Amino acid sequence: MKVPMLVLSAMIAILFATMIPSSFAITSNTSPIFFSGPMIPSSSQPVSPNVVTGVSQFYSANWAGYAYNGTKDTITKAQGSWIQPAVTCTPGKNDSQVAAFWVGIDGLTSKTVEQTGTLAYCPQGSSTASYYAWYEFYPAQPAKFVSKVTVNPGDKFEGIISFNSTSSKFTVTLKDLTTGIHFTKSNPAGFTGKRSSAECIAEDPAGGNSAADGLYYLANFGTVQFGQDYTAAKNTCSVTVNGKIHAIGSLGARTDELTMVNYYVPTIIMAQPSTLSTDKKSFTAIWESLGY
């Protein structure tokens, strides 16, 4: 699906106007405002499956990684893990640089996302990155930081998103496997999700001011490692569909490989995933460019 430039910019502007609390501001001394929203398709797409890995292949303006593209009301859990990469800031740019790493349910083809992860943030003009733990039930609320979990480069993280069919509640848990500290949060009242996709993703979040599409520069994270092969966290990255656990890359054409590119100039690659491990659970995502 192609999203016209003016429509995309208008959508992001409306989101900012209606969802960012007026008491929030972005300065070099505060944490960033960002939205880890649904996947934004690029202005052009490959049209054939990736015959090398046996999965479907797409370009995205904000996501890089792997996703399961399922059907509504079938997913009850998504599990992911990663090693927090050290970010290199690039001073002299006219906006901040951000990179988010997360596991979630929904957002691939729906307008909701239930997710938790970590974030690296380089304030405009700074050469030093700050790191945060966060969760989000989009679009019910902007991403919320959790100070209980301190994020350091090299730490291993595990995220779990689960749905309780009895209470109709989503629960997100993020655990620093290196320190043992974790948090758990449930969705706000009235929130509902489609439960139609699951993802392990490196993202360029929305919230930036310099680009017409509203995205930040993608911070240089080098390489981020996802999955059990790197973290030893069991069943990561995986999705539970109709009660059965599947490796996220084991579902053939239902598995989407996502390469992040500049929305307006899709030949500019920002980040791309590696092929999947033998067990289809693990992969790396490699930073390629700031994007603009």
Model-found features: residue ranges?
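Exposed, interaction-prone regions of secreted/extracellular proteins
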Residues: 24-292
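Secretory targeting signatures
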Residues: 1-27
